[in-house]
Amino acid sequence: MSKKLFRKGILALAVSSVMGLSTHALADVVIGVAGPHTGANASFGEQYWRGASQAAEDINAAGGINGEKIKLVKADDACEPKQAVAVANRLVDQDKAIAVVGHFCSSSTIPASEVYDEAGIIAITPGSTNPQVTERGLSGMFRMCGRDDQQGVVAGDYIVNVLKAKKVAVIHDKDTYGQGLADATRAQLNKLGVKEVLYEGLTRGEKDFNALVTKIRASGAEVVYFGGLHPEAGPLVRQMREQGLTARFMSDDGVVTDELATTAGGPQYVKGVLMTFGADPRLIPDGKAVVEKFRAGGFEPEGYTLYSYASIQSLAAAFNGAGANDPAKAAEWLKSHPVQTVMGKKEWDKKGDLKVSDYVVYEWDDKGKYHQLP
């Protein structure tokens, strides 16, 4: 699809709302916060918005960006690619954003980033891990997270070297993110000498996976790896347990929300579930004061909250470092300078990937909470 097609005829699909952090007269630096603010994955959108809002408030209180205030614009893509392109056009054409924090689902980030590239603005995704996000040569696309080909290695290593599994079922949701991560994990399993006993896709939005569970049972899998998001992971693990399957269930950073226990039907179903995610940013000393501020306000900064906060910090540092609110100059600055964030020091390579990835394994308890394993 040509880039021009991204910019025409689809603005009517946009679903977005504008929320400023200051008066219009002072809100000169417009930054979009794009992600699933509605729909099944809205909990991730809330994490994005909470993190970005607190960061913008703190940065504005300290003088803003080159003396100007940040104004945030909420852009809801519902993790739907067509809607993502629509809101990207809205951010560029109507809201005049010069930077974006987003999107969440890789299948949304990839097409939306073409719009941003054509418009010459900079974007940082806190959570899109598919390698193609940064493999297309876009000059202004960055991540605050790792990549699936890094995360899949960690998952595969853990399944083979720690769980000692010989029979592994690999399940995915047929989406760019979920299937890409499942394939990366499968590749690592195969590299370590373990051939999957089942490789199967499910459909996002479905809730009845009993037929799939029957296939998993027949495969004799000791571990079930699922590449996808919590709205499907929850019902899948519950139906496994209801059918008496005791195989370990492992997933990814698409389930890093307390909503996993809700979609599973209760915390008892997610006890023992494993997942890969970056090292818990709430434990990093650099972010202690910010974490305490969130908690004092009654919000637990789980998942991608601090990733979003750090993304706003990095954009502010880049514009300030460049000495102008010029996205191209900010992107070049970010590729050659480290930024101290609530998640510690971050540095990017020329593609926009972090130079250091820190994926680890977490386990869910019987209270529906996840904890980083040593």
Curated annotation (Swiss-Prot):
InterPro entries per UniProt: Leu-bd, Leu_Ile_Val-bd, Peripla_BP_I
Subcellular location field: Periplasm
Family note: Belongs to the leucine-binding protein family.
Sorted UniProt keywords: Amino-acid transport, Periplasm, Signal, Transport
Annotated signal sequence range: 1-27
Functional summary from the UniProt entry: Binds primarily proteinogenic amino acids.
Major subcellular site: periplasm
Record has DNA-binding as a keyword: no
GO biological process: isoleucine transport; L-leucine transport; valine transport
Protein name: Amino acid binding protein
Gene Ontology cellular component annotations, sorted alphabetically: outer membrane-bounded periplasmic space
SUPFAM superfamilies, alphabetized: Periplasmic binding protein-like I
Superkingdom per UniProt: Bacteria
